[in-house]
From Swiss-Prot:
Name of the gene this protein is made from: glyS
GO process annotations (BP): arginyl-tRNA aminoacylation; glycyl-tRNA aminoacylation
NCBIfam families recorded: glyS (TIGR00211)
UniProt KW ATP-binding keyword: yes
Identification of the protein by name: Glycine--tRNA ligase beta subunit
Length: 679
């Protein structure tokens, strides 16, 4: 079958860098999905993007759809043929419905029953006759943010300026918002000009001639190579932030790296401020020496060539100098502050219109933190540190520096607190109470920081739940899922055996059930990330108490034992107790009502297991705890072999069920064994 290459390029006004890659991938997925849907075979797919274009190249696209041959099944033979062997109306109707004649029908047996069948054949259409449908594919792309322009109804990420659509050397004809498809694309805005693409395979090279590097991976490698060359030539170290590298890559069509300098006196400003100014505000790469100390230089990437590059460097230096001068001023002004005066200013900042001011939040956090510290048996000095850290945790939010650099909240707070004489533990906690700042991020390194972080996150979650702001689907505007995951991460990192139920006693809430379910889902998410089996997760989360540290370690022990010899039988015995216990109620067990020795032996085994489990759990020895439960298997099996739990005598029945309920409670303190899938 003959084949042709396919090229589709959407030319746009400059797109936001953060949306570029996912938009390119979406276009590629939609195009290959369309080809598959249309039964059009193809070869290699290559994706391109720049701030002004999204493009897909598909090699060896078939010039014709595959023919479709399939067998259609009709009515059963006994319905399709009458007594004389003639086709019935049912058979005739089936053949017409399939576009066939009755002469094409045949009988075939399926699972012992004979049915009427017909072979269907649909000849494939020429690909070029279908390709104009790509206009709908282009307009179907979804973006996080859209706009309208002119009098057009189409909402799109940016106005469409040109479209290149080629199948082989032929243009695929269609139009979108009065833009006709063609073969003309645009080169670099300043260094290139219009160019007519000869064929899809020539696309990348022809654009390169117009100072456009269409392949984002090639652009990225160019930037990395230029950074490495500069570092080697100047004996520098350039710590490359992958997110920044990707963003810069998606801001340019033809990258040329250059470096500039700033006055060394600016190095007296905290490094975090300098780095944030360069990376977040200017998209510059900071420069360090081989010892990791910041140098008064930066690297930026120009969208163009090296023409007049010294002037470009001077211009960037001027912009950075102005920003650093502002930062220096803010830093000096903030050193005049009084922490307690700043805390009072929090009264004038609204946390949320239904939840009061930031000062109100700080008071709630302080109360929770003190209760939590007492629960964790903190000494008197540590309690004072926790209280003070919670009270001043938000003081830096009213500083000049955080007004300008909100991403440095906590970080600058720690520096200012230390500078103004706060205890080291208190200063560190001002920063650490925001940790972890992202999923999988660093957790607080100090006890005080961990306690205040837990309190702050717990208050945020409980407060928003109290006013009905509960995450649903993809909607989580206040990042409550991240906050809950942060609480779980801290509990696991600090080995604190505090259950969700106990945590909720530290806050005032009427949404306890909703909060427990929410925290359980976040714990399930964390356990999934640890590659724990789904049935094991369900088993431990159905235990009597939801406590992250024990849940993780119980799950890990269960996973290790699942394939062990005899574990299947043990799990079945323990699960049998849980199942039958559902028919009873919790009550006192009366040994004088035992009718055989096996009831007594199981009662003794239960008491031993209960005592052992208390000791195992207090030592956090979950392997020993599972062994304590495994020791119940034989007395459980013997009990069921010789005892009818659902006895005719109501007193005996109630006593035996009470024994099952008590035993099930101990088993479920580890896990619900019935949730396990053991083979």
């Amino acid at each position: 079958m003959s084949k042709q290459d396919l090229l589709l390029e959407i030319g746009l006004e400059e797109m936001p860098a953060r949306f570029l890659n996912e938009s390119m991938v979406q276009l590629g997925d939609k195009l290959t999905g369309w080809l598959k849907e249309k039964n059009i075979t193809h070869g290699e797919v290559k994706l391109f993007n720049t701030p002004r274009r999204l493009a897909v190249f598909v090699k060896d696209v078939a010039e014709k759809q595959d023919d479709i041959k399939e067998e259609a099944k009709g009515p059963a033979k006994k319905i399709a043929l009458d007594a004389d062997g003639n086709w019935t109306k049912a058979a005739i109707g089936f053949s017409k419905g399939q576009g066939a004649n009755v002469e094409d029908l045949y009988i075939k047996e399926v699972k012992g029953i004979e049915y009427v069948f017909v072979q269907k054949f649909q000849a494939g259409q020429e690909t070029k006759s279908l390709l104009p449908e790509l206009s709908g594919l282009i307009t179907s792309l979804h973006f996080p943010k859209n706009m309208r322009w002119g009098n057009e109804d189409l909402r799109y990420i940016r106005p469409i300026k040109w479209i290149v659509a080629l199948f082989g050397q032929d243009v695929i004809p269609f139009s979108i918002t009065n833009v006709e498809s063609g073969r003309t694309t645009q080169g670099h805005r300043f260094l290139g000009h219009e160019v007519s693409i000869e064929s899809p395979s020539a696309y990348e090279e022809q654009l390169k001639g117009q100072h456009v590097i269409a392949d984002p991976s090639v652009r990225k490698q160019m930037i990395q190579s230029q950074l490495e060359t500069m570092a080697a030539e100047n004996n520098w170290s350039i710590p490359v932030d992958e997110d920044l590298l990707d963003e810069v890559n998606h801001l340019v069509e033809y990258p040329t790296a250059l470096y500039g300098s700033f006055e060394s006196e600016f190095l007296s400003i905290p490094e975090e401020v300098l780095v944030t100014t360069m990376k977040e505000h200017q998209r510059y790469f900071p420069v360090k020496d081989k010892n990791g100390d910041l140098l008064p230089h930066f690297i930026t990437v120009r969208n163009g060539n090296s023409h007049a590059i010294e002037n470009v460097a001077r211009g960037n230096e001027k912009v950075l100098r102005a920003r650093l001068s502002d930062a220096s001023f803010f830093y000096k002004e903030d050193q005049k502050l009084n922490i307690d005066a700043n805390v009072k200013k929090l009264e004038n900042i609204v946390f949320h219109e239904e939840l009061g001011s930031l000062a109100d939040k700080v008071r709630r956090v302080t109360s929770i933190a003190e209760k939590l510290a007492v629960r964790l048996q903190a000494d008197e000095d540590t309690l004072k540190h926790v209280k003070r850290a919670a009270e001043i945790s938000k003081f830096d939010l009213v500083t000049h520096m955080i007004y300008e650099f909100p991403e440095l909240q906590g970080i600058m707070g720690e520096k200012y607190a230390r500078m103004l004489g706060e205890d080291e533990a208190v200063a560190a906690a001002v920063n650490e109470h925001y940790m972890p700042r992202s999923a999988g991020g660093e957790t607080p390194s100090t006890f005080t920081g961990a306690v205040v972080a837990m309190a702050d996150k717990l208050d945020t979650i409980a407060s928003f739940f109290s006013i009905g702001v509960i995450p649903t689907g993809s909607q989580d505007p206040y990042g409550l899922r991240r906050q809950a995951s942060g609480i779980v991460a801290i509990l696991l990192d600090r080995n604190w055996g505090i259950s969700f139920e106990e945590l909720l006693t530290f806050v005032q809430t009427d949404k306890e059930n909703e909060l427990l379910d929410f925290f359980t889902q976040r714990l399930k998410y964390v356990l999934n990330a640890e590659q724990i089996r789904h049935d094991v997760i369900d088993a431990v989360l159905e235990s009597s108490e939801l406590e992250p540290y024990s849940a993780l370690h119980k799950a890990q022990v269960l996973e290790q034992k699942l394939g062990a010899p005899g574990f299947k039988e043990t799990a079945e015995a323990l699960g049998r107790v849980i199942s039958i216990s559902k028919k009873g109620v919790r009550g006192d067990i009366q040994p004088d009502l035992f009718e055989n020795e096996y009831e007594a032996k199981l009662f003794d085994a239960y008491q031993t297991a209960k005592q052992n489990l208390q000791e195992n759990f207090s030592k956090k020895d979950y392997e020993a705890a599972l062994a304590s439960l495994a020791a119940l298997k034989e007395p459980i099996d013997a009990y069921f072999d010789h005892t009818m739990v659902i006895a005719d005598n109501e007193s005996l029945k109630a006593n035996r069920l009470a024994q099952m309920v008590s035993l099930a409670d101990e088993i479920k303190s580890f896990a619900n064994m019935n949730a396990l899938i053991v083979k």
